[in-house]
Amino acid sequence: MPDPCCIDKCECKEGGCKAGCKCTSCRCTPCEKCSSGCKCTTKEDCCKTCTKPCSCCP
């Protein structure tokens, strides 16, 4: 069963999705660690490209 925060909408917090919310349709901005630690422009790219994506790149 999906997390309640992902059923109707994405809930963003600084650094990515709200804690516990791992929704593929979420379009939160990458966190500082992601944007500074890898060259990916989106967390989706980070997840696919980087070997060790941070927690906001599910």
Curated annotation (Swiss-Prot):
It comes from Carcinus maenas. The keyword Metal-binding applies. A divalent metal cation 6 binds at residues 40, 46, 50, 57. InterPro entries: Metalthion_crustacean, Metalthion_dom_sf. A divalent metal cation 1 binds at residues 5-6, 17, 21. One of its GO terms (molecular function) is metal ion binding. A divalent metal cation 5 binds at residues 34, 38, 56-57. Residues 1-29 are annotated as: Beta. A divalent metal cation 2 binds at residues 6, 10, 23, 26. SUPFAM superfamilies: Metallothionein. Disulfide bonds: none annotated. It comes from the Eukaryota. Residues 30-58 are annotated as: Alpha. Keywords: Cadmium, Metal-binding, Metal-thiolate cluster. A divalent metal cation 4 binds at residues 31, 34, 50, 54. Metallothioneins have a high content of cysteine residues that bind various heavy metals. Class I MTS in marine crustacea are involved in the sequestration of elevated levels of heavy-metal ions. Belongs to the metallothionein superfamily. Type 3 family. This is Metallothionein. A divalent metal cation 3 binds at residues 12, 17, 26, 28.
